[in-house]
Design a protein with these regions (language model features):
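A short, N-terminal "cap"/entry segment at the start of jelly-roll beta-barrel domains
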Residues: 1-50, 133-135
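Conserved short histidine dyad/triad with adjacent acidic residue
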Residues: 35-42, 54-69
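Short, conserved beta-strand element in jelly-roll/cupin
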Residues: 56-59, 68-85, 126
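A generic "binding-loop/recognition-motif" signal
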Residues: 60, 71, 90, 106-107, ...
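Histidine-centered metal-chelating micro-motifs
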Residues: 63-65, 84, 100, 104-110
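Short acidic-glycine-tyrosine-enriched beta hairpin
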Residues: 89-104
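Ligand-binding loop in jelly-roll beta-barrel domains
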Residues: 104-130
Length: 135
């Protein structure tokens, strides 16, 4: 068995969509003590559809630039803060505790219009069987 535990403090952040910070906590590229081997591949079937789990932060008055993902959908879980999200032509307010679903191939952007940092978990998942194969 291979145990994977990842703390955001041990991950280098990257700039996300020009305005936010993103800590990629888990992805298909996550390594433990080497490459993910055949045994791990068999045991972690759910990872075949997950492209990433990230901790994201967005400062007040900033927005992610509008973007879309051709090969995966996303779910955001809002940990802290408030703002609004635009998905396609629809706009909705959000606050801590909300879960937001974003379909693949759909233009979206998130805006922090509150006074504190927006912090959220972003889960990316392949639709269909693109990553894992099979039918």
């Amino acid at each position: 068995m291979t145990l994977i535990v990842q703390n955001w403090r041990n991950v280098y952040p990257t700039i996300a969509h020009k305005s936010g910070l993103d800590w990629r906590l888990l992805s298909m590229d996550t390594k433990t003590d080497g490459d993910i081997d055949a045994e791990v591949d068999r045991k972690f079937q759910c990872l075949k559809s997950i492209t990433y789990v990230s901790l994201a932060r967005l400062q007040p008055s900033l927005s992610y630039e509008p973007h879309e993902h051709q090969d995966h959908e996303e779910i955001y879980y809002i940990i802290n803060g408030s703002g609004h999200i635009k998905i396609g032509d629809e706009i909705a307010k959000f606050r801590d505790g909300d879960v937001i679903y974003i379909p693949e191939k759909t233009n979206h952007s998130i805006t922090n219009d509150g006074n504190e940092m927006v912090e959220f978990l972003a889960f990316g998942g392949f639709t269909g069987m693109e990553r894992g194969g099979g039918g």
